[in-house]
Curated annotation (Swiss-Prot):
It comes from Dehalococcoides mccartyi (strain ATCC BAA-2100 / JCM 16839 / KCTC 5957 / BAV1). It is an enzyme of class 2 (transferase). GO terms for molecular function: nicotinate-nucleotide-dimethylbenzimidazole phosphoribosyltransferase activity. It catalyses: 5,6-dimethylbenzimidazole + nicotinate beta-D-ribonucleotide = alpha-ribazole 5'-phosphate + nicotinate + H(+). Gene3D superfamilies: 1.10.1610.10, 3.40.50.10210. HAMAP family: CobT (MF_00230). Disulfide bonds: none annotated. The active site is at E318 (proton acceptor). The keyword Glycosyltransferase applies. Its EC number is 2.4.2.21. This is Nicotinate-nucleotide--dimethylbenzimidazole phosphoribosyltransferase. Pathway: Nucleoside biosynthesis; alpha-ribazole biosynthesis; alpha-ribazole from 5,6-dimethylbenzimidazole: step 1/2. It comes from the Bacteria. The lineage of its organism: Bacteria, Bacillati, Chloroflexota, Dehalococcoidia, Dehalococcoidales.
Amino acid sequence: MELLNATLAKIYGLDKEAMVKAQAHQDILIKPQGSLGKLEAIVVQLAGIQGDAKPKTAKKAIITMAGDHGIIDEKFHNWPKEVTVQMLQNFAHGGAAINVLSRQVGARNVVVALGVATPMAADPNIINRNIAPGTNNMVHGPAMTREQAVKAIEVGIEIVNAEVKKGLDLVGTGDMGIGNTSPSAAICSVITGRSLEDVTGRGTGASDEQMKLKRNAIAKAISLNNPDAKDAIDVLSKVGGYEIGGLAGVILGAAANRVAVVVDGFISGAAALIAYTICPQVKDFMFAAHQSVEPGHRILLEHMGLDAILKMDMRLGEGTGAALAMNIIEAANRIQHEMASFADAGVSEKQS
């Protein structure tokens, strides 16, 4: 807990003075005030995070964390757990969707194994921080110990701290793990208080029969383990996943370093919900990249008071939505840096 506690102690609110200056600059640019809508709000929030009316967005990374889940033993999933490590290898060598979209936005990919079940060969492009070979089946007991949950969070903090040392203005979250919509739905239901019918989606394409099995399994896990909604680490340990804990740590660590976090889809959203429950202040540092088709994603975003930048009917994960949203965030910041003012352009201002 030492690293987690030290990280939490460094998190404080947005720089209001920088935000006022950023908005004042927006207001003298050659456009009606407020006419760029959310683009203006994005850059003002960035200014508050970085403490600079003209923030930076050049140095970007997407951290994709992987973990397997014991609940796949319940036999309602379409993909074998071996796919997790196979996709990790694709991430590491540039062939996956996240690699393509990261190249588009100029973000470096950071690939982390945190709870992968299948043994894998050493790879210089994969950071192997495996805590365990996947979670336990939460239908029969806690997914992990409390100590393992804290460790997952602290690994996430360590990973983002290392990226900050390399130079980091924006960090995106991404996930990989067969079965990870089930713990995400459990986390969402427990913390928001919404029913499993409301928050549980089809994941990678569950049939109606598989959906019944999925909801029943998650309901059993919640009933048996009885997680405390006010104790995010308890929730994570009982019905969570290692990659979810790791991404929660990335979010907390980024906030402690005054780095904006672009939160991807449902699994990243569950991680954000864990981080938010631990430290509500982290909301100020988060941008919701997109709204996934997973129904629980909209619910957890509403719970945290976050509005998604994009709505693209996506449900892949990996950090793909975060990469896309970085384009919008960077565009907002270019307006702040490059657009002419009324005085610069010789354009008459609105008459009062």
